[in-house]
Every structure is written in C-alpha cells, then in structure tokens.
C-alpha cells in the first residue's frame, strides 16, 4: 500500500501525517509509512496492538510519540525494528488484557530516546515492570 485517502466528511476517522485515528478517543488506527520519520500526530491519545502499519517499514524508521499519547496497550510498538522517540516528560500508562503482562508494552529492545530531564522517570517506568532495564536508552 502506497496511498490511502479518507473523505473529509468521515464522521468517525480523521487523517493527519499519514496516520488515521478515531476522532472520539484519539485511538491510532493506521499508519502509512512513506519516509524514515514517522510523526504520530498530537491528536493521538492511545496506541494499541490493533494499529495497522503499512508502507516503507524497516529497521531505520524513527517513530516520534507525542506527549499527547497517554496510553499504550501491549504489543503496540515496532519491536526492535524502529527507533522510538518519546516526547512526553511522563511515560504513557500501560494497559494489558492480562495482569502482570504490562511488560509487553515496553520497547526495551528498541533504540529509545526520551527528554533529558525525563530519563530517570523512563528508567523507573521499565524497572516497575518486572525489574526490566532498557537496552538502548538515550536522551535528546
């Protein structure tokens, strides 16, 4: 898939930066990857494991998660295939359908960048989930 379009009259979904999201709750529904850098729009509040990612997907993608993202659901990320940039000073809340399975929402095997002043918060975010540690954590 190289192109998607959405009617401006669509009452349920909206498209911005090649991302389709549900208007009612800000759930990211689909991402069409056209370039290395994927900018998730600031209207997105939730990223879960149902998001459809299509297009130029590769190990060099950069996924920029805005501070507006308040919740991630297990298995949402691109695993080790992308570099993740969290722009929020506070990490999103992790939701899992199974108690104790929240660790599946942590991109600990990806290269991850977080704001310099929030590094300790993100380290704690991982540690609070079964004592996990980041393998490739950086700041910007």
Where in the sequence are the language-model features?
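Structural signature of tandem-repeat unit edges
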Residues: 1-19, 26, 30-48, 55-71, ...
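Acidic surface patches and DE-rich sequence motifs
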Residues: 22-23, 128
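Short, aromatic/basic amphipathic alpha-helical patches
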Residues: 75-76, 96-105, 120-135
